[in-house]
């Protein structure tokens, strides 16, 4: 499962990940649907093959915010269409989930209770919310109730808890299971850890022991296919969620597909092959956003794509300022395409940072059974 990541998992990146997830043979030429074997086609869109769009707020969706609606763009052949909702209010959750169901906006709803960012937690949202267990249960129940009678599953993603003194994942898992969630996913870090340190896979194993009737997915520190297999072996979880590990590496899903089906791993791409993937990503972004915004967006991806490769500071700096597709093409032609995939490109990528105190609303920890909806927690400046 591709984890929703703000500013990353839009339709363009999901397209690349989906294509690689159904690769047959050549890593750079994924098999289109009409060329997949019946077995390959049947595996596309299973719980281990979901590619979730970047998070949108339930309130912004209900208000039909233009930016939010554009963020929920899916490719014509994308199936199932997975949408993640950020929400703090049962009533708004119900309205948003009902809108998704009634208008056919998506085939799967994931719910975000894992964001550790201060602007979110200080208002009681994201990773702070599961501490309010009654409110958390009401929100999950609202989404499930809104999709009753449809084939739209509701899944729930959360963290271990606020910090080492306030773990919430076991309660959250049991509550989500009781309220009808189809699966739960645990990012095995606390909000205080943010993206730093090491994911505590033992907590995934504990959650799996507590949640028995629905799948439990694990998230955290999966950077290659062997990590995914190791997590499942160690924790007993039913599947994995890939986040930062696939930044600049959409072909990771080809490696995962091979590992889970017992096929030989595809050869890692050369620098020339990576350049071709960057070109395709850039073209998809321009088609989605237009050239100006598309090229501004590709810049961060280029840094991830070239992670560990020798490229030189001058060329990297030029790529970090690229403005047009033609310029992108010229700059990529300057790379040495024969360079093999380097060992330095393997391992952690993306933001890591340091642990930090978690900002919370006043008296947030006083009563975990308080189901008062936090004020202003569902208002995002981005429209997402």
Curated annotation (Swiss-Prot):
Alphabetical list of Gene3D superfamilies matching this protein: Aldolase class I, Putative flavin oxidoreducatase, domain 2
Entry annotated with the keyword NADP: yes
Residues bound to FMN: 4-6, 84, 157, 219-221, 243-244
Gene Ontology molecular functions: flavin adenine dinucleotide binding; tRNA binding; tRNA dihydrouridine synthase activity
Top EC class of this enzyme: oxidoreductase
Domain of life: Bacteria
Pfam families named among the record's database cross-references: Dus
Keywords for this protein: Flavoprotein, FMN, NADP, Oxidoreductase, RNA-binding, tRNA processing, tRNA-binding
Catalytic activity reported: a 5,6-dihydrouridine in tRNA + NAD(+) = a uridine in tRNA + NADH + H(+); a 5,6-dihydrouridine in tRNA + NADP(+) = a uridine in tRNA + NADPH + H(+)
CDD domains per record: DUS_like_FMN
Cofactor: FMN
Active site: 115
EC number per UniProt: 1.3.1.-
Family, as annotated: Belongs to the Dus family.
Function: Catalyzes the synthesis of 5,6-dihydrouridine (D), a modified base found in the D-loop of most tRNAs, via the reduction of the C5-C6 double bond in target uridines.
Protein name stated in the entry: Probable tRNA-dihydrouridine synthase
Gene: dus
